[in-house]
Design a protein with these regions (language model features):
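P-loop NTPase motor domains
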Residues: 1-181
Length: 181
């Protein structure tokens, strides 16, 4: 791999789990005019970012993003005891992603904002019937655009009892826990 890199004759995407290739050839590539980017999922502070929201063009792309995220966060060989929780968490995530995709400014279309929205919808007390800030956000959307696709998913998610909604939120938060880093 290194001899090919040192020829500096094309663009490269390199798998370098130990960081050895970067250490040995990174400075050379930069001196030859290459822009070296690192995606490090272990040390996120040393990593360039990837925002899949940038690539969302249509509703089908949003569906694929959520489906792929759930597939990639399911441990290999595991079987859901009750698919209700994952399906419901997926509906909530679809509501949030669709909302951001169609309603938020570009700089807010990211998973950090998804986590903020999820926290804004947190159900602290199951006896408290007041709407959460997230409920209010979707209520405003309903007033301006009652047929919005995000609302369709939010209504499906929000049709359960408070205890059920809290469990769905926890299921989704567990799936997205890496986005808290």
């Amino acid at each position: 791999c290194k001899p090919n890199l040192m020829q500096c004759n094309t663009s490269f995407v390199i798998l370098d789990p130990k960081g050895e290739i970067l250490r040995d050839t990174g400075k050379l590539l930069e001196s030859k005019g290459y822009e070296v980017r690192v995606l490090d999922l272990i040390s996120m502070e040393k990593s360039h970012c990837y925002n899949p929201f940038v690539y969302l063009q249509n509703d089908n792309d949003v569906q694929k993003l959520v489906t792929n995220l759930f597939k990639s966060t399911t441990p290999k060989g595991s079987q859901a005891q009750d698919p209700f929780w994952d399906t419901s968490a997926s509906m909530l995530l679809l509501a949030l992603v669709f909302y951001l995709h169609y309603e938020a400014p570009e700089d807010e279309q990211n998973f950090a904002m998804i986590m903020e929205m999820l926290r804004a919808g947190a159900i602290e007390d199951e006896e408290d019937t007041r709407p959460s800030p997230l409920d209010e956000l979707f209520a405003e959307l309903e007033m301006s655009n009652p047929d919005h696709i995000a609302l369709k998913y939010y209504r499906s998610y929000h049709s359960g009892a408070a205890k059920t909604l809290k469990s769905i939120q926890i299921t989704l938060a567990a799936r997205l826990e890496k986005f808290n880093l």
